[in-house]
């Protein structure tokens, strides 16, 4: 239990964190990786280089300081981060290392006096305990469910399928021949990649793109081509070098962006690009469980060349009365224009969306590039969709949609 004095001191640093939060977290990671380079085997190097991880941590530290007197408010965020930590294999023994480096960064960047550092040290201990407790439960649950396991388990690529010019699916079965644990549609796994010539292991999270209950997991990976940045190292390696018969270490499914199976409301699934992957899991699950809920499936892509799983979704639309699928192309090819194989050219806009969704009293799920998600979030808000019915997933560190 933190004293009133400690709470007061921590809350007094909120303006400082608002101003210098990213500077502090940037310095924190510099200290962390220089003194503990082995942790580079856990963290996503690309997110570090792009500053996304630093921003995400700054947001989390700011929220912790703001609500240090009522941490229940940020428990949903703690759980969301906890899922990511569990999937990466972050353990209780890592937290003291992080705490020491964070306090050093606060001192170096902000010149914080000992009184502030001591208060933050106490506060960090309480916050770390919350993470450790929640993550311990997650590890326990993942390991003890049927077909479950702890940390990483070797999976064999039994099938590799090209879904579009940029997206390829990998079907994964356990090397040990055992069962795979079930998951909730929308969840992801971490895949561990060791690239020849690279010093450190690369970990990447990929949404499971098929319904649970199979003998395999399916991930569908976009080959990331850099614009003013290098190409995606891991996605290109998977596309170009990983073949059927190869082995990949995989963590048990995790994540809190999940389909609400208890709701009876209609479902609207909106995706941009590779954001289609968790939506495919949700759509396939609703079909396989014989759900009678109306499903509106809206996908945005450049054109048919980059549009993954188009034929599968169209087949479900044709076969099931409750499924309606719509496609939006921002750069249709001449063939697309000739064949008229899409519903709208340009972006997903409120006026068009309003004509195809069954009702605003529905559960809305969306995923895609950050700019796309900000646009969809604003559009749904403008249409009057209740916040509790809006669900979304970031590929990478969480960011603000405001």
From Swiss-Prot:
Family to which the UniProt record says this protein belongs: Belongs to the globin family. Two-domain flavohemoproteins subfamily.
FAD-binding FR-type domain boundaries: 150-260
Binding site for FAD: 188, 204-207, 394-397
Keywords: Detoxification, FAD, Flavoprotein, Heme, Iron, Metal-binding, NAD, NADP, Oxidoreductase, Oxygen transport, Transport
Lineage of the species this protein comes from: Bacteria, Bacillati, Bacillota, Bacilli, Bacillales
Site (Influences the redox potential of the prosthetic heme and FAD groups): 84, 393
Binding residue positions for NADP(+): 273-278
Marked site positions, Involved in heme-bound ligand stabilization and O-O bond activation: 29
Protein name from the UniProt record: Flavohemoprotein
Record EC number: 1.14.12.17
Active site: 95, 135
UniProt cross-references to InterPro entries, sorted A to Z: Cbr1-like_FAD-bd_dom, FAD-bd_FR_type, FNR_nucleotide-bd, Globin, Globin-like_sf, Globin/Proto, Hmp, OxRdtase_FAD/NAD-bd
Cofactor binding: number and manner: Binds 1 heme b (iron(II)-protoporphyrin IX) group per subunit. Binds 1 FAD per subunit.
PROSITE patterns: FAD_FR (PS51384), GLOBIN (PS01033)
Positions of region (Reductase): 147-402
Every Globin domain range: 1-136
Catalytic activity: 2 nitric oxide + NADPH + 2 O2 = 2 nitrate + NADP(+) + H(+); 2 nitric oxide + NADH + 2 O2 = 2 nitrate + NAD(+) + H(+)
Comment, domains: Consists of two distinct domains; an N-terminal heme-containing oxygen-binding domain and a C-terminal reductase domain with binding sites for FAD and NAD(P)H.
Pfam families: FAD_binding_6 (PF00970), Globin (PF00042), NAD_binding_1 (PF00175)
Function: Is involved in NO detoxification in an aerobic process, termed nitric oxide dioxygenase (NOD) reaction that utilizes O(2) and NAD(P)H to convert NO to nitrate, which protects the bacterium from various noxious nitrogen compounds. Therefore, plays a central role in the inducible response to nitrosative stress.
Record-linked CDD domains: flavohem_like_fad_nad_binding, Yhb1-globin-like
GO molecular function: FAD binding; heme binding; metal ion binding; nitric oxide dioxygenase NAD(P)H activity; oxygen binding; oxygen carrier activity
Cofactor: heme b; FAD
Gene designation per UniProt: hmp
Biological process (GO), any one: nitric oxide catabolic process
